[in-house]
Amino acid sequence: MKIKLYIPTCDKYNWLIQPFAYTFNKFWSEDIEVVYLGYTNPNFELPNNFKFVSLGKNDSLENWSTDLRNYFNSINDEWLMMTVDDSMLTSRTDSKLYDLALDYLQKTDRKIGRFGLERDLVTREHQHWDTHKGFNLVEAKNEATHRISMRWSIWIREYLVKHFVQGMTPWTFEEDGTINSKGDGWGIISYSKTNPPKPPDNSVVFNTNALWRNWFRDYGRFNIMDCAHEDPFKKIDDETIDEMKKLNYFPQGIEFGSIYNKKWYKVRV
């Protein structure tokens, strides 16, 4: 099974496509098709495995879920990946774990809505779900927060579309979706190293960073630290940062740094 990665975005963050694409192809593969779902087409060339689809006019944020629901209802993919536009790869992808996830989804007869691929689900309440080829799988408990999440995940399209209710923003998609997902009969799962699991204990497919945002304000900051890794102090290597700077992938005046205990620390790179 081969699936595509979909990334919702907006005009304000079109500039993130270039550093995202660079780290994606460096730390994973140029054979995976990536589809950006945005509004105004970017004014730069995309790598061969990247595609930009315009959803129309970049207007009210409340149209976010409606635009995505309409798009995903128009395609035939049974399974797909999705993530946010400001969470890029920071080190090599565990391709073996990724392939095993696809293998499990093809072979199991259990209902799975979302398969988390990074250090996310396992940091909250979870329990044993299954074992597949030597790897433990855990599911989010009903009381867990962020059962519905925009973090790197594989989704069955039917379940994803169900949660794109009209008038939702990315934040209410996660908040309301989590409430609506409780007891709905769909598994929300991820990898685990130990059984019974003790957080944080998972094996992750992707190690990622996240741009520093505070509610609806953008501080023009780029987090170089890995926020979804077993080692929270691991950062994107200097060589990769230097390569992207030479290619002018960052806007003038962008600040580089790290986040610790919800505080921003500027660093020189």
Could you say what each language-model-derived stretch is?
Residues 91-123:
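Conserved donor-nucleotide/metal-binding helix-loop-beta segment in metal-dependent transferases, i.e.
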Residues 18-21, 62-69, 94-103, 170-178:
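Well-ordered, non-membrane alpha-helical segments in soluble/globular domains
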Residues 78-88:
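Short beta-strand-to-loop acidic/aromatic patch adjacent to the donor-nucleotide binding site
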Residues 1-60, 65, 70-79:
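N-terminal anchoring/stem segment of glycosyltransferases
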Residues 1, 228-269:
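Membrane-proximal basic amphipathic "stem/tether" segments
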Residues 128-145:
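Short, flexible, basic/aromatic active-site loop/helix in glycosyltransferases
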Residues 35-37, 80-82, 113-118, 154, ...:
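A structural signal for short, well-ordered beta-strand segments and their strand-loop junctions
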Residues 147-228, 232:
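Catalytic core and acceptor-binding pocket of nucleotide-sugar-dependent glycosyltransferases
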